[in-house]
Amino acid sequence: MSRLSCVLTIALSVTALAACSPAKQAGPNAAPSAGEINLYTARHYDADLQLYAAFTKATGIKVNRLEMQPDQLIERTKAEGEASPADVILMADAGALWRAEAAGLFQPLTTPTLAARIPVALRDPKGQWWGFSRRARVIAYDKAAVKPEEVAHYDQIAGPRFKGKVCVRSSDNVYNLSLMAALIEHWGEAKALNWAKGVVANMARAPQGGDIDQIRAVEAGACQVALTNTYYYLRLAASPDAADKAAAARVGLSFPEQDGVGTHVNISGGGLAAHAPNKAAAIKFLEFLASDEAQAILAGANHEYPAVEGLPSPPDVAAYSKFKSDPMAVSIYGQRQAQAQGVYDQAGWR
């Protein structure tokens, strides 16, 4: 199924945007509908269908979902302008949220519910967007070949120990960009550039694939270490496929910087679209994402960490939840994103 295709799931009361076309003019002259919202999302997780179904069950409001890649979503919404039917925009990375904000896709929103439940570090200072789940960017390693203390810090994978033994995805991946932005903030650009150059020198192959591909490459012996988000590993571990479970069993996860600033943590989040025709319903949806029910779905169905503090997680997620996380405000990832890409380019990380 194309990422630009609509997804119609009648059983879940999730309806598609009409013809997936901006021809559905829901701009300032269109009548709002209290019974639906139009969701533009860069989250591509089947588990999210449970979120939409739960929201519809609780409120009677239908969710019309259109999935796109982050840059496509931004460009499409900009092109639609005031006629955009989008009510809510979701992204899977703080840097992408910041780019959407810079493009004028959000309007400020602060409600008592959101302000009380979403930590300050996980949201835009101006209320343009809010984080609803967290994910840590960790080091996956071959448990048979690598000792945990050899991957206790991000800079270790750039050292001579891992020459020809590192697998990574491309530098323009949003998760890698946000990690680099955080490293620049902590280390300064010069040290971050040296780190990127070291990783490039240590690559076992050209950057390719997604996070699960990196984990599988470690398990297959193509490399000994890789960068991944936690929920991809947990997805493999929870898979009904025996090969996936075996791969997860042979790969360990290191949460770097436990003796320092803590492991890099990113968010998935969203905000109220700038020209939302169904504003009241959209606000209900955003507040629902911060509810105990939605937070439990994000943790249980997609193995993400809740954004709301103090909530329990399923056993598999909880087992990897006891770590020190970097308290950095995630808005910094967007502010330094262009600089991060420039560092990767200088290092030759394609």
Predicted regions and their residues:
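Ligand-binding pocket segment of bilobal, Venus flytrap-like solute-binding proteins
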Residues: 171, 175, 182-256
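Periplasmic-binding protein-like
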Residues: 164-172, 288-311
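A bilobed periplasmic-binding-protein/Venus flytrap-type ligand-binding module shared by bacterial periplasmic
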Residues: 138-145, 265-278, 297
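An extracytoplasmic/periplasmic, membrane-proximal ligand-sensing/linker region
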Residues: 190-192, 303-350
